Structures are given as C-alpha cells and as structure tokens.
C-alpha cells in the first residue's frame, strides 16, 4: 500500500512540476513562440530516436525478470538484466551519436529550423542516459521495488524544472536574451535531468546489489 501511495504522489508531483516549467517557458520574455518552436522541433527528433531506442523496454524487462524470479532463477534474472544493459547501452550510444553528429543535417534539412541545431546537440546525450535508465527501471520493477523507479522519475522532474529555469535565466543574461541559446539551454537541462535519474538508479544498484540479489 505504501508503495502505491508513493507512486501516486510521485506522478502528481511530476505533472505539477511539468506544468510549472512549461508555463515558465511559454511566458518567459524573449522565449515565447519562437523559443517554443525551436525547443519543440529539437525535442520531436529526440523523442523519435528515444522511441526507437527504449520504447517498451521497462515493461519487457520487468516481465522477463519477474518470470525468472517466479521460478527461483535469480541468476537468470540477473543475466537478463546484464544482457539488456549491454544491448540497450549500445543502442542508446548509437542514438546519441546519430543525433550529435547529424544535428546540422537534421536542423537544416528535416526540421528546416536551423536554430534547432544546438538544441539537438544539447539533447543527444539524453538518449544514452534514458536507454540505460529504462533497463534499470524494468529490472527494479521486475523485482517489485517500484518505489525506486518512482523516486528516480521524481528526481528527474525536480532537476528538470529547477535546471530549466536556472539555465535559461543564466543564458538569457549572458547572451542578452538569445532565443536560440535559451532553447538550447532548456534542453541542456533535460539532458542533465536524465543523467540525475540514471545516476540515482545506478548508485542504488551498486550500493544494494548484494541485498537485491
């Protein structure tokens, strides 16, 4: 019951924080419609690559791990986790490199918004972090430690909200309110937030590995 309450509270907090930074970006002077267009165009490409690299991963791994644990095969559950970690780590790394090195082409030819190039570069590392995190989430869910993934998601959203506002304000001050740089800064915040979630899941696993199994 406590785990369900934690997850419910986490989801509510995530939605509230998401609303806060969305309203901030929409109403921030110098960002406005132009900034949102740059931000959104880059984010759409990022979301597409993210879908390819990690869609359905947590649920699939959770199912496989729980099936192994149900028959007492703890080593099998851990083997599934390690294979998935290596596999999706490689897929995430490829996605990151595609977005990083292809940012110029994507911005000028696909989105036809040249200003989105920096946004794409800023987002590229997030694909790797999210791909790895999705494997950890599936593993922990399969072991019924749902609170861990809820905390990681909440931590990510807290960092995203705080860092988005902080970085955009700093960039606006330094660049005299450059819309392009502010949009890129907002997506740097997204990347740092995904890293915070990855770091939490990784450290939890390292510190509790023997206890977990």
Language-model-derived ranges and their functions:
Residues 42-64, 88, 125-128:
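Small-residue-rich midsections of specific transmembrane alpha-helices
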Residues 101, 112-136, 162:
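Alpha-helical transmembrane segments of multi-pass membrane proteins
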Residues 94-117, 173:
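Short membrane-interface helical motifs at transmembrane helix boundaries
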Residues 59-104:
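Membrane-water interface segments that mark the loop-to-transmembrane alpha-helix transition
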Residues 26-48, 115, 179-188:
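Interfacial/gating helices of multi-pass transporter permease domains
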Residues 1-20, 75, 79:
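N-terminal membrane topogenesis motif
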Residues 130-152:
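Membrane-interface junctions at transmembrane-helix termini in multi-pass inner-membrane proteins
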Residues 147, 158-199, 203:
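Membrane-interface helix-loop junctions in multi-pass transport and translocation proteins
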